């Protein structure tokens, strides 16, 4: 069955941990903004019909991103939190479609990982993730309480892939209960779903701190040279 697949890129955050003079999605790597690198991944995929980008209503930078003029891209205004920004984007997407939600600050996603995720046809949805390889500590402030069993722990990545109608319902339910929604999978979990974990690549990093920029630029250079 052919599915209508829409990508959602929440890009209304300010990125305070980057300590930069502008939101991190507008910082440049290889003469392109991080947002442009991210958008190019989805614009190039033949199975993705449309991309909805959620930006802050007061954002003075997004009009300068020429790629956002693509007829395949629709702009909406974000909300108070990432989850509300995603929800706002879902309002312009048909309920019978599937939605891929991806962080604007993850420009190193590989096409091979995206293709793996798009093969999933399970209404509970799926996310890219990587198994925890470091020793994981439970903390109380800055003191260790205990060591967790890392064999059952995964790092959640994006994209995260769900039926639009179910994700919308899950977010509404979470908002009504004042639950903290840190990613789309958590909203689905709160509503009794068990999204699948699809093992992804660890170089699909989220640019969060200044030191992440050099690593992301290295990965992007590798992608260009190897055409992954």
Swiss-Prot record:
User: Transferase: is it a keyword of this entry?
Assistant: yes
Q: Which domain of life is it from?
A: Bacteria
Site annotation (Transition state stabilizer): which residues? 17, 24
Q: Which organism is it from?
A: Actinobacillus pleuropneumoniae serotype 3 (strain JL03)
Q: Which residues form the signal peptide?
A: none
Note the coiled coil stretches, chain numbering: none
Any idea which GO molecular function terms this record carries?
Answer: 2-C-methyl-D-erythritol 4-phosphate cytidylyltransferase activity
Q: Pfam families of this UniProt entry?
A: IspD
SUPFAM superfamilies from the UniProt entry: Nucleotide-diphospho-sugar transferases
Q: Which GO terms describe its biological process?
A: isopentenyl diphosphate biosynthetic process, methylerythritol 4-phosphate pathway
The record places the site described as Positions MEP for the nucleophilic attack at 150, 206
Please report the name of this protein according to its UniProt entry: 2-C-methyl-D-erythritol 4-phosphate cytidylyltransferase
Please give the function described in this protein's UniProt entry.
Answer: Catalyzes the formation of 4-diphosphocytidyl-2-C-methyl-D-erythritol from CTP and 2-C-methyl-D-erythritol 4-phosphate (MEP).
Q: Which keywords annotate this record?
A: Isoprene biosynthesis, Nucleotidyltransferase, Transferase
E.C. number(s) listed in UniProt: 2.7.7.60
Pathways involved: Isoprenoid biosynthesis; isopentenyl diphosphate biosynthesis via DXP pathway; isopentenyl diphosphate from 1-deoxy-D-xylulose 5-phosphate: step 2/6
Please name the PANTHER family in this protein's record: 2-C-METHYL-D-ERYTHRITOL 4-PHOSPHATE CYTIDYLYLTRANSFERASE, CHLOROPLASTIC (PTHR32125:SF4)
The record's similarity note reads:
Belongs to the IspD/TarI cytidylyltransferase family. IspD subfamily.
Catalytic reaction equation(s):
2-C-methyl-D-erythritol 4-phosphate + CTP + H(+) = 4-CDP-2-C-methyl-D-erythritol + diphosphate
């Amino acid at each position: 069955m052919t599915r209508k697949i829409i990508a959602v890129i929440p890009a209304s955050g300010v990125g305070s941990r980057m300590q930069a003079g502008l939101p991190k999605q507008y910082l440049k790597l290889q003469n392109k903004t991080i947002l442009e690198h991210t958008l190019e991944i989805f614009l190039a995929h033949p199975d993705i019909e449309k991309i909805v980008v959620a930006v802050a209503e007061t954002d003075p930078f997004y009009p300068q991103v020429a790629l956002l003029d693509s007829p395949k891209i629709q702009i909406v205004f974000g909300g108070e939190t990432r989850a509300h920004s995603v929800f706002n984007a879902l309002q312009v997407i048909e309920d019978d479609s599937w939605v891929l939600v991806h962080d604007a600050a993850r420009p190193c996603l590989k096409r091979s990982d995206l293709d793996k995720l798009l093969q999933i046809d399970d209404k509970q949805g799926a996310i890219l993730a990587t198994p925890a390889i470091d020793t994981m500590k439970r903390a109380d402030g800055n003191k260790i309480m205990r060591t967790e069993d890392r064999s059952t722990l995964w790092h959640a990545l994006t994209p995260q892939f769900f039926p639009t109608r179910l994700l919308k319902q899950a977010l509404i339910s979470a908002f009504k209960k004042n639950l903290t929604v840190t990613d789309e999978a958590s909203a689905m979990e709160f509503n009794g779903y068990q999204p699948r974990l699809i093992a992804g690549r660890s170089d699909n990093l989220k640019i969060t701190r200044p030191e992440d920029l050099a690593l992301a630029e290295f990965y992007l250079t590798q992608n260009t040279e190897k055409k992954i």
